[in-house]
């Protein structure tokens, strides 16, 4: 089997499973649908691991080939091809591995779903295929198709419960916000096609870069901008939409309207990592624009800190994890801005495992609570759900960067990258990610203590407290006890907990300080020496652990955990008093900085009002009543006046003839004596 055949199988097997489950779901039944899709993703995952191992042991080389050309237009070829190197192989394993866990978990989570079971499995396999096509692409056009495909399938999955108004609003919101980002992304691709040698293949674009290094473009008359900077920023606008960076982040928390398994897949391994992967893949372009890198770093820092603040006040267990995703995506974006692309991709990998674990553990707790998602109704679940408790604890310890857990190595590396960066804005970025350490630890363990410790709060609730939480809005009765989830739910938790602990220790040496990304990621060490400094300062996992003992990061995390314990275990009455004392800030956080209100009332309603204006004034008044109907009325009015001259009396016609003759005589004399 040659390489291209292998890569085609990896990409197409999930698509085949999706089509079978989607088109023949009624014939093969629920068991047939989940069997065929799980089998497809499992084959893809095993083969992806085989590909990655080939790069690790040196038996596999980078591959960049076109599979076929599907359109030729004006000398430009639009091809489907695969670029498979170490970064691609790592992402293939992450995407298919997490997707496999989500597929297995879904059997238990969606067990009681009366309709849409086969449809859901079809969607998540299609999601996996779309992401694989995105990360394996060797050209911008295929990248864009994969980019749009994950956006489309996320729309279908977020709105899976399409009879629920909040779900249809959420998926439309996600779709429209991403269209804003995708418009910028498409403009960036257009500039690449127009100015970077007339090719959309990555290797051709990168080879042409020296020819446009000093090129400028006029966005406005008389104002020259660096062509590369404008291209980088437009491409990054696309990344801001897909990877939910401020201010295009507002769709991500609402994606919780979809079932929990898809929340894990979107937030951990697929859609939100697409933008980060794209920027890392385009590192040769971004390294030529320090301005673009500074903008990226500052936006990432804003997202990391200010989205973390919003996680502090959430009461929905899934939304806490969602805001942690936003904050962690901000961390990764800071790393990209610091030219630490390998660090960003390292955190993409570690984050995928512990974030999928956190979402699926949250889903297990939701199952135990009979689909009540409000943490204020939980408490002491540790007693009833020990596997869920332990795996959630592992996920949170990795999230906050506890030494020896996977998240520690990647998260601390990002903080160090911001510290050593010399770009404008790096000081703010370092402060933001440092402050976010405390905030992350606080909201992560606030969630942990509210759910797994303290009083069993559901026993003090009215019998019907299922007003707006959960997928089916049930909730435990006063005398009910939660039960541990079945093996099909807990097994993925256990399997995801393993890399959440060890993958950082195993991978940090080759990915950050070795040559794992050699000839894949390009860094201009003279202009952006961050990684060079880090390689001199640290020499592996144990050196980072030793360094953490002298760093404020560890102590900020400990302070965050202790603060959460104090407020939600020892003094549970205090948070309400603090919220009341700082009411304006609480209201600001509760309204999410009023960005949703701004977008809805200004942009959405403003666009609708503008549309109504053009409809009523432009279309109805001017075109319909003015030009179309008005011209008909004008002709009718003229005809009516002309008709009055048709009297039927001969003397009227004789007078008209005399008048006409006089006019002709007058014109003749005018011509003779002029």
Predicted segment positions?
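Hydrophobic transmembrane alpha-helices and their helix-loop junctions in integral membrane proteins
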Residues: 98-146, 152-479, 505
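Membrane-entry segments of alpha-helical transmembrane domains in multi-pass membrane proteins
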Residues: 1-12, 28-35, 39, 76-94, ...
């Amino acid at each position: 089997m040659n390489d291209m055949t292998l890569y085609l199988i990896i990409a197409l097997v999930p698509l085949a499973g999706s089509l079978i489950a989607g088109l023949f779901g009624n014939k093969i039944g629920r068991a047939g649908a989940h069997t065929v899709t799980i089998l497809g993703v499992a084959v893809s995952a095993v083969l992806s691991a085989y590909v990655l191992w080939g790069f690790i042991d040196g038996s596999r080389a980078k591959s960049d080939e076109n599979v076929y050309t599907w359109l030729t237009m004006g000398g430009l070829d639009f091809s489907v091809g695969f670029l498979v190197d170490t970064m691609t192989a790592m992402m293939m394993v992450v995407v298919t591995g997490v997707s496999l866990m989500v597929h297995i978990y879904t059997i238990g989570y969606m067990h009681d779903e009366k309709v849409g079971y086969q449809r859901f499995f079809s969607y998540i396999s299609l999601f996996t295929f779309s992401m694989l096509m995105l990360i394996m692409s060797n050209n911008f056009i295929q990248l864009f198709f994969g980019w749009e495909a994950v956006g489309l399938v996320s729309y279908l999955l977020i709105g899976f419960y399409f009879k629920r108004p909040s779900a249809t609003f959420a998926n439309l919101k996600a779709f429209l916000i991403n269209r804003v980002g995708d418009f910028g992304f498409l403009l960036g691709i257009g500039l690449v096609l127009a100015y970077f040698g007339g090719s959309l293949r990555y290797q051709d674009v990168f080879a042409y870069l020296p020819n446009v290094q000093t090129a400028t473009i006029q966005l406005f008359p008389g104002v020259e901008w660096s062509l590369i900077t404008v291209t980088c920023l437009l491409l990054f606008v696309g990344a801001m939409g897909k990877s939910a960076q401020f201010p295009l982040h507002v769709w991500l928390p609402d994606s919780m309207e979809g079932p929990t398994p898809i929340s894990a897949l979107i937030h951990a391994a697929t859609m939100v990592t697409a933008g980060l992967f794209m920027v890392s893949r385009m590192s040769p372009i971004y390294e030529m624009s320090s301005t673009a890198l500074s903008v990226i770093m500052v936006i990432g820092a804003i997202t990391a800190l200010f989205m973390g603040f919003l996680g502090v006040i959430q009461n929905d267990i899934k939304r806490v994890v969602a805001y942690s995703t936003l904050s962690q995506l901000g961390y990764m974006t800071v790393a990209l801005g610091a030219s630490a692309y390998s660090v960003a991709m390292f955190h993409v990998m570690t984050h995928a495992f512990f974030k999928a674990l956190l979402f699926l553990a949250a889903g297990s707790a939701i199952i135990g609570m009979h689909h009540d998602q409000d943490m204020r109704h939980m408490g002491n679940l540790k007693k009833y759900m020990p596997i869920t408790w332990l795996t959630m604890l592992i996920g949170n310890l990795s999230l906050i960067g506890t030494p020896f857990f996977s998240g520690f190595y990647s998260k601390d590396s990002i903080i160090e990258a911001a510290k050593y960066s010399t770009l404008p804005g790096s000081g703010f970025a370092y402060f933001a990610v440092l402050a976010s350490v405390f905030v992350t630890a606080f909201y992560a363990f606030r969630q942990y203590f509210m759910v797994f410790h303290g009083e069993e709060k559901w026993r003090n609730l009215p019998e019907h407290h299922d007003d707006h939480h959960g997928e089916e809005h049930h909730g435990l009765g006063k005398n009910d006890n939660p039960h541990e989830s079945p093996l099909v739910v807990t097994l993925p938790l256990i399997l995801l907990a393993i890399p959440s602990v060890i993958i950082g220790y195993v991978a940090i040496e080759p990915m950050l300080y070795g040559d794992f990304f050699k000839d894949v990621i390009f860094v201009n060490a003279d202009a952006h020496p961050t990684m060079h400094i880090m390689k001199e300062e640290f020499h592996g996992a144990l050196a980072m652990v030793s360094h953490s003992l002298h760093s404020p990061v560890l102590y900020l995390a400990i302070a965050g955990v202790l603060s959460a314990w104090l407020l939600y275990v020892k003094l549970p009455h205090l948070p309400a008093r603090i919220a009341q004392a700082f009411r304006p800030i609480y209201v600001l956080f509760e309204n999410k900085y009023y960005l949703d209100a701004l977008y809805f009332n200004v942009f959405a309603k403003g666009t609708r009002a503008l549309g109504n204006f053009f409809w009523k004034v432009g279309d109805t008044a001017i075109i319909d009543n003015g030009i179309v109907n008005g011209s008909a009325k004008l002709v009718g009015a003229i005809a009516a006046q002309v008709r009055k001259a048709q009297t039927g009396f001969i003397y009227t016609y004789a007078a008209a003839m005399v008048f006409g003759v006089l006019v002709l005589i007058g014109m003749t004399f005018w011509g003779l004596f002029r």
